[in-house]
């Protein structure tokens, strides 16, 4: 059906046979700049290249061990025609170091350090905008207007890198402009993690008894450099900040497509968004609220076997303090206990209790008691199940407990 949707409903004008033949040309043959049959997804997107490098070293002695890791990761962008690869990519740098030392026969010390930096650079135009443009822009519209030698526009060509981007009153954005002349933004995130742990066997008191304590601290900060070209609005219409050009209003793009007479006759171009050059890129720096989280826990563990009887117990203290910018600190504190018993790994009993608090609640209502218990029976350990070859493990378990949530106030 020869139907030109950009014409009025009562217009008898259709695409000429020349325009139809041009539209049928092989994809990618747009060397004269007239477009005809753009595949915008092919024009705008490309497969990305991933690079991942890492170097690790480990070693030590009977009493001390270490591990060091450094890595570099780069993912190229999926956009073609961006200003450079550095304006369309993702970078990540990782570092980790772990050291474990047996200070004495019973005392062990562990130090873990980790750091990560990520950099994400992207065009000023959003991915949603670029994908929407690829889906909706008519494929017969030109992307770049050819330099037809008209003296009126020679200065404009020089000021715009030797080419003019096409747009009109109906299609105000240009794919090449969105990719290469909308500016860019760069978001950098930094993470730092560290922990220090001590553990000590207390078997000189009783067999199976041990104690451990750990302190950790994590930090995070983020800043974004915004060098994107701002858009501007006229009435209820939004225009890009880069300059776009079109034919004078007395000409239509359909005449362009049907006979190309206008550019052959050296006609002049006029601005489509009242800009002869691109607006200046933005130059702003924004910071996310820095975050710092400290955690401390201490625990006493007991595990021992008495013939066919297995007994374990644990008492834990936990504290967390999180600071986000100038906000009120988020604090959590709690004590937990657990005791387990089993007979021949067949009959299982467990009891847990927690006494936990959060600063989200008012004074006098910050702590709660949360008990839980369970019983279990490993049926497959019974003598009458030994000859049932199609069942390796069968356990029945029932449990009941109370839990808390501090995100309800």
Q: Which residues does each PLM region occupy?
A:
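Flexible glycine-rich, low-complexity coil/linker segments exposed to the extracellular/periplasmic environment
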Residues: 1-39, 138-178, 229-230, 237-290
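Flexible loop and strand-edge segments within Gram-negative outer membrane beta-barrel domains
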Residues: 31-71, 75-82, 86-172, 185-189, ...
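Transmembrane beta-barrel architecture of outer-membrane proteins
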Residues: 50-54, 90-94, 189-195, 293-297, ...
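Residues on the lipid-exposed face of transmembrane beta-strands in outer-membrane beta-barrel proteins
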Residues: 53-61, 97-101, 194-200, 298-302, ...
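Short loop/turn motifs that connect adjacent beta-strands in outer-membrane beta-barrel proteins
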Residues: 62-63, 106, 188, 201-211, ...
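Transmembrane beta-strands of outer-membrane beta-barrel proteins
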Residues: 66-68, 109-111, 209-215, 311-315, ...
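Solvent-exposed loop/turn elements at secondary-structure boundaries
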Residues: 168, 386-409
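Signature of Gram-negative outer-membrane beta-barrel scaffolds
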Residues: 219, 317-372, 387-391
């Amino acid at each position: 059906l020869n139907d030109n949707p950009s014409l009025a409903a009562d217009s008898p004008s259709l695409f000429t046979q020349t325009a139809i033949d041009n539209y049928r040309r092989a994809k990618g043959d747009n060397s004269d700049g007239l477009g005809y049959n753009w595949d915008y997804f092919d024009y705008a997107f490309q497969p990305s290249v991933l690079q991942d490098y890492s170097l690790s070293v480990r070693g030590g002695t009977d009493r001390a061990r270490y591990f060091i890791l450094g890595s570099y990761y780069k993912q190229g962008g999926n956009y073609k025609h961006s200003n450079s690869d550095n304006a369309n990519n993702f970078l990540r740098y990782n570092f980790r170091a772990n050291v474990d030392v047996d200070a004495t026969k019973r005392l062990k010390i562990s130090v873990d350090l980790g750091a990560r930096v990520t950099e994400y650079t992207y065009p000023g135009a959003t991915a949603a905008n670029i994908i929407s443009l690829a889906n909706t822009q008519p494929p017969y519209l030109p992307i770049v207007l050819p330099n037809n030698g008209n003296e009126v526009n020679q200065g404009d060509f020089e000021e715009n890198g030797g080419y003019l981007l096409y747009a009109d009153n109906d299609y105000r954005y240009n794919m090449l402009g969105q990719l290469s002349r909308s500016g860019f933004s760069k978001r950098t995130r930094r993470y730092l993690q560290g922990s220090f742990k001590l553990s000590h066997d207390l078997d000189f008191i009783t067999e199976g008894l041990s104690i451990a304590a750990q302190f950790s601290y994590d930090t995070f900060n983020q800043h974004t450099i915004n060098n994107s070209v701002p858009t501007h609005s006229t009435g209820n219409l939004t225009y890009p900040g880069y300059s776009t050009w079109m034919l004078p209003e007395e000409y239509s793009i359909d005449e362009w497509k049907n006979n190309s007479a206008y550019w052959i006759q050296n006609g002049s171009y006029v601005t489509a968004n009242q800009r002869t050059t691109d607006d200046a890129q933005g130059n702003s720096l924004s910071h996310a609220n820095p975050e710092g989280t400290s955690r401390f826990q201490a625990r006493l563990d007991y595990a021992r076997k008495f013939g066919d009887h297995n007994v374990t117990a644990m008492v834990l203290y936990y504290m967390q303090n999180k600071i986000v910018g100038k906000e009120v600190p988020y604090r959590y504190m709690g004590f937990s206990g657990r005791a387990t018993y089993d007979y021949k790994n067949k009959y299982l009993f467990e009891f847990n209790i927690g006494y936990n608090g959060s600063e989200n609640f008012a004074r006098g209502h910050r702590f709660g008691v949360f008990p839980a218990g369970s019983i279990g029976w490993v049926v497959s350990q019974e003598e009458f199940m030994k000859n049932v070859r199609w069942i390796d493990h069968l356990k029945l378990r029932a449990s009941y407990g109370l839990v808390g949530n501090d995100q309800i106030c």
